[in-house]
Amino acid sequence: LSMVMYIIFPWLYNLKEMGRWSVSRFLLTYFIIVISYSLARWFFGGRLGIGLDLFGLSIGLWIISEVLFKFWSPTFRWMSGFVGFIVAVVFGISLQEILSNLVEYWWIILFWVPALFSTSRPALTRTYTPWFFLGMFSYLAAFMIWLQGYPDTFYCQPDSWIQPHAIWHLMTALSTWCFFKFYRTERER
């Protein structure tokens, strides 16, 4: 639950800024998503009974909304959903795989959620270098380590001093710190 609570925050915050939401609307929406997710996961399992990985989708929604935040325009607003396919490819889901199995990947339609709610150019600006890119690099490096260090693999040896899972935790902590520093660069336009 904590990972989902963390990862929905950035894209929802971006929607708040581009949709001109009040803080109370933002928090209400955030807690409705968290509580709904918690209950659905409790009763229906990790894919919520509908084949939806909210954590994975939220990574895509964050990048989509971040690109839209940076390059907002009325036209790009509706094109921004296509960024989600690039994110999917980075995380190992090919466009061919998605298009050949739309029943499983039905959730790609949610790539356009940021476009629906991002009705205005953000009133804030952010500095992306170096913190955003360092955060992305450390997160993607952590993801690659995660793919190698799971049980019954060569790199997952419980008696070793070097544990990929522990390195993954350190790398994701570093990425979280970088993203914190990135959000601290926000300024009024």
Region spans (language model):
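Multi-pass alpha-helical transmembrane bundles in non-GPCR membrane proteins
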Residues: 1-189
